[in-house]
Amino acid sequence: MLETLQQMGQGFIHALTWLNLLAMVGGVTLGIVIGCLPGLSAAMGVALMLPLTFTMPTDTGLIVLGAIYCGAIFGGSISAILIHTPGTPASAATAIEGYQMTLNGQAGKALATACWSSFWGGLLSCTSLYFFAPALAQLALKFMSAEKFWLGIFGLTIIAGVSSKSIIKGLMSGALGLLVSCIGLDPIDGTQRFMFGQAFLAEGINVTCALIGLFSMSQVFILAEKKIVEREKAKKFSDKIALTKAEKKMLWPTVIRSWIIGNIIGILPGAGASIACFMGYNNAKQFSKHKEDFGHGAIEGVCGSEAANNAVTGGSLIPMLTLGIPGESVTAVLMGGLVIQGLAPGPELFTKHAAMTYTFFAGFVLVQFFMLTIGMLGCRGFAQISRLSDAILIPCVTVLCFVGSYAIHKNLSDVVVMLIFGVLGYLMRKFDLNTAAVVLALILGPISEKGLRGALRVSGGDLGCLFASPVSWVLIVLSVIGIFSPILMAKFEKKVTGGEVLEE
């Protein structure tokens, strides 16, 4: 325990360098800008900036990505409040009361509430990182090859299923990702697989290129296709922004309840902020003493939604960092960033790389304070970003996609791979398939394969080794549950969203 406290303290010392502080400010600002642009997502923003972190120290690069993540989740509330168009699915419930407050001349108050609630939801969720992540990491140290295989299968079944609207489509997306993960040289005997004579595929598909293509370039195609539809412009506002002491006192119980809800949802693989925001909103409505205000601009509704969706951020990092199971698309991209940096998500992050991990944790805490400061000071300015035309947005994102993919190895083949995955992502979204499931399978596929083949090599080919330990059986049961859980999750999500199912 004492050693952990010392590592926490050292983490804050390392996080408070000028480089890391600048990374927090820049990441939060960029995240808010991305989040408040309807059509862009936190996952897309993190994927887009991933190549730029290659030249940074590992902890600084992760802090930048974490800052973009937090900033984008809050940024989605800006357009949700001002133009009734959530910048990200995580702010869908915020639009219900937030836009009504705008119509009532309280846009500034709504934005201040969203920012204040986001800060506390995110800050409280950081406590989970400190208290639960190290404990789970110690448990993960007991995982051998067979357990790692079933852990990968568990992650694939839950994420590929729950993150899609149907079991079949979710599993199809996951299967496609597994197929793509097989491209390149066999990790055991070096046999060529699906390379078709192309030497640049020897190391497999570059995860960063796939991320940029699936999340960013595909969105460019979507925006270009919808260019003929003019987006509603953000409304101006002039009311006072600051929350009163009485309002903060009234909102505190809502913040605490939404933090608990969002944290639990974040830890569960396959769930996400889009579900948490509606659960937080519904909970705020159920416990409110002024239920008649809901639907007409209830400040508690904005608070409940934003505190819950930002509480997801800290919780969602726990399964990714400790078990290597990214719970949603954003943490899948962050996991890709770890892999690219040569770091394997799991218990080693808390032993061999403890200094880097706790620096990232400390940075994640400090990011919440920068988000509060920048959000409060820049509400009026960020609101104008929502007014940007797609004619400006599309070419800017396109240039970033090309530059980002080329910068990885300074090779045009990476640009080609990015474009191919961009087209693939566009087609998948047109056919309502989940792009996040492809990325998760692309990352988890090699982990499962190495676990399976490693276990079989040790046992001399005896399949019984896969069923020998109690941990394996626990993961098998969880995997079976994961396959069928989308049915229950879909019914639950339909209930909390009033019939509208949202995707990350």
Feature map (PLM): residue ranges:
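Transmembrane alpha-helix interface/packing and boundary motifs in multi-pass membrane proteins
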Residues: V28-A42, G71-H84, I159-S164, I260-P269, ...
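A structural-propensity feature for long, helix-poor, extended segments
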Residues: Y69-A80, G87, A298-L323, G327, ...
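Membrane-embedded alpha-helical modules
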Residues: A112-I228, I340-K494
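Membrane-embedded alpha-helical segments of transport systems
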Residues: C70-G75, W116-S128, L136, V180, ...
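Short helix-coil transition sites and intra-membrane helix breaks within transmembrane domains
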Residues: I34-A43, I81-A92, L124-S128, I265-I275, ...
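Helix-loop-helix hairpins and the membrane-proximal interhelical loops
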Residues: M1-D59, P134, Q138, Q192-A298, ...
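Membrane-interface alpha-helices at helix entry/exit sites of multi-pass transporters
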Residues: D59-I63, Q100-S117, K289-G301, S329-A332, ...
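Re-entrant/interfacial helical elements at transmembrane boundaries that shape
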Residues: A42-L52, L65, A80-Q100, F131, ...
